[in-house]
Amino acid sequence: MLRVFTASHCPGHSRTRRLVAALARQRPHLPLELVDLDEPEAERPSFVIGTPTFVWGNRILFLGNPAEGDLLARLDALEGS
């Protein structure tokens, strides 16, 4: 599962949301969760030290917003392995 951690104070917050929406359209089969750390019930793993953070399992894929093509290529590689 890809989990994307974000918060409203993050300068890239709007871009993160657009990127996640595009990803959901392009890879509808991909388990995906957008975690808004502003929500009181949101759980932040200790290894998430900034936002946005893109996490596959317990592995950080990107800290900061990647280019859409880079994100898609990385996810395709992970799903194929």
Describe the predicted segments one by one.
Residues S14-R18, S46, P66:
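Generic recognition of short, well-ordered alpha-helical segments
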Residues P45-G57:
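Structural micro-motif
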Residues L23, A42-P45:
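Short, flexible, glycine/charge-rich loop motifs used to bind or transfer phosphoryl groups or to couple energy/partner
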Residues V55-S81:
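Non-catalytic, surface beta->alpha helical segment in thiol-disulfide oxidoreductase systems
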Residues G12, H29-L32, T53:
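Hydrophobic residues in alpha-helical membrane-spanning segments
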Residues F5, P28-A42:
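Thiol-based oxidoreductase modules, predominantly thioredoxin-like and allied folds used
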Residues R25-H29, A77-G80:
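Secondary-structure boundary motif
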Residues M1-Q26:
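Local sequence-structure signature of Cys/Sec-based thiol-disulfide redox active-site neighborhoods
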